[in-house]
Amino acid sequence: MQMVGLPGLYPVAKEVTMMLSAWIKIPYTIFVCVLVPIYWVERGPANFLWLSDVALLAMVPALWMENRFLTSMMAVGVLLPELAWNLDFFLRLITGFDVIGLNATGYMFESHCMPLFNFFSLFHVMLPLLLLWMIHRLGYDTRAVYAQTLLVWVLLPICYLATDAERNINWVFGIGNPPQTWVSGPLYLLVLMCAYPLFVLIPAHFMLNAGFNRR
């Protein structure tokens, strides 16, 4: 309940309508709470530096607060990569081999992975749908592209300095696996920090702004 009123008058109660159902908020929160320890055991805490994992976690407060800015920020940051993940995954599932050649979803078909880890990794299928639904309900905040660019510029160097090339988190050591060797690591990182906003964030921004901006 929110209190509103006019000058010189007592405030009156005004009902605040929640735009997102608890039937979405509660199951999603439970899903993330179960996923976190499974991922921690299987891949370690560094795995949560993936931009998709950052978005997965950030959507918990975004859902409960119905926060348009945070939702928009996560959508502009991961929507296109998540769609690419789904394309790679379903093509591999149907054909049985890596069609795209980036080995982005190979881990989903490795027998040594914990079955629960593979199951919860299917959040990549659900996450873009959730993001688009929330943007549809809340609208798109055009400031998101600037904030997400700053986040990317902070997160990518952290991944480069604090994680192993073997993990190649956020592909800071090369596109796909194995890591690239054609230029020096720092130069490649700099190129990636410029390319990600240009080829991922800005196109997603224009698409979301055209489709969902209410201003």
Say what each PLM segment does:
Residues 75-114:
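A basic- and aromatic-enriched beta-loop-alpha substructure that forms the phosphate/nucleotide-
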Residues 37-46:
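Short, hydrophobic transmembrane alpha-helix segments
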Residues 30-37, 79-88, 151-163:
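Aromatic-anchored segments of alpha-helical transmembrane domains
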Residues 62-81, 139-152:
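Interfacial segments of alpha-helical transmembrane regions
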Residues 105-119, 181-189:
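Short aromatic-rich membrane-water interface segments that cap or initiate transmembrane helices
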Residues 159-201:
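Membrane-interface transmembrane-helix boundary segments in multi-pass integral membrane proteins
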Residues 12-27:
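N-terminal membrane topogenic signal
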Residues 121-144:
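Alpha-helical transmembrane segments in multipass membrane proteins, preferentially the mid-helix core
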